[in-house]
Amino acid sequence: MTEIAAIHAREILDSRGNPTVEADVLLADGTLGRAAVPSGASTGEHEAVELRDGDKSHYLGKGVLKAVDNIESVIAPELEGMDAANQRLLDATMIALDGTPNKGRLGANAILAVSMAAARASANSLKIPLYRYLGGANASILPTPMMNILNGGAHADNNVDFQEFMVMPVGAERFSEALRWGAEIFHTLKGVLKKKGYNTAVGDEGGFAPSLSSNTEAIEVILEAIELAGYKAGEDVAIALDPAASEFYDKEKGKYIFKKSDKSEKTSEEMAQYWESWTRQYPIISIEDGFAEDDWQGWRYFTELVGSRIQLVGDDLFVTNTERLQRGIEEGIANSILIKVNQIGTVSETFEAIELGRRYGYTSIISHRSGETEDTFIADLAVATGAGQIKTGSASRTDRIAKYNQLLRIEEQLGQTGEFLGLEAVNFGE
């Protein structure tokens, strides 16, 4: 019986040493479901609210005791006795309890922890894997990894304006092979950077953050590493970018300012042309947040320019939110949506965003946050939804590797029924 008997929550630490929320959902049959929520460094303005205490004497104001208390004193009394397997009703009940458009009263971190834990408890009670519980009998697609191996922007102290440079092993035949290729390139890149005298410490997501001289040098060292590892750039392995352009957009000037590199300023049209020239010069197949979250005009121009030949992903633009995605669909903006469960705050709404995108030909990429935990929910979510792509960091740091290892286990469980789409998972706007 999947009836909820008790809900408990606690304050734990994420991969950056900041507090986050973990929830336990205990069912009447004694089954436990546990989930921990992640948090982001570069967050979109339109994301659901992550409730922090603001008490400087407790974790420098970043505590989440209010969110924990909201679970135990507000959410638990309402949900206890309900069926954990009725995900939509549980999530709708918590949304109604909160009563704000952005989950600002109870906190998306409180609501999401319970939403995920309930799903896991139900799967455990039914003795089926989480991906099977969430995705049904046909869930069999393993995602192509987008591995963030080099960092700039808000994730690094260097002269690189763009936040993430990723490799996608699109030519691999199965997930485990793609992961191996990515790991080999990551280790080869370390050697390339060392040889050039650069620091090889890793950032929040396990990628290197050396003091490179420019944005182009970042791409060039990756291309060198791909080749040295024995792979062909553009054929075996492609490049994906997440510039996180909101971080270097000046709203007052209405311009993109390369503050960290050459201090140049670009209008939206010039920025679109800049990206277009990069896609001609380098084997780039996906650009996420190439424009600021509210620069709809820039996004439109960009989509018209290159949307028919590369994947254009909205993260800060859409924030896993169906209303913003609907606007993007109507205006012909982007062709892919990044899915971060904590941007919207419930499992049900996450599925709704993926389904809406799919209806209009938008791909989905399941994503981690820079502040992660050992929770592997998103690995199962990627398979459950058949998203075909996952973004969960580099080939280092246990908080990232945990997701990859879970996908290796799922690949093993699926056996011959498992599918790996490689390049086919990526939307070229066709």
From Swiss-Prot:
Matches recorded under SMART domains: Enolase_C, Enolase_N
GO cellular component, one term: cell surface
Pathway the protein takes part in: Carbohydrate degradation; glycolysis; pyruvate from D-glyceraldehyde 3-phosphate: step 4/5
Cellular compartment(s): Cytoplasm; Secreted; Cell surface
Record's cofactor remark: Binds a second Mg(2+) ion via substrate during catalysis.
Record keyword Magnesium present: yes
One GO MF term attached to the UniProt entry: phosphopyruvate hydratase activity
PANTHER family: ENOLASE
Name under which the protein is recorded: Enolase
UniProt organism field: Acidobacterium capsulatum (strain ATCC 51196 / DSM 11244 / BCRC 80197 / JCM 7670 / NBRC 15755 / NCIMB 13165 / 161)
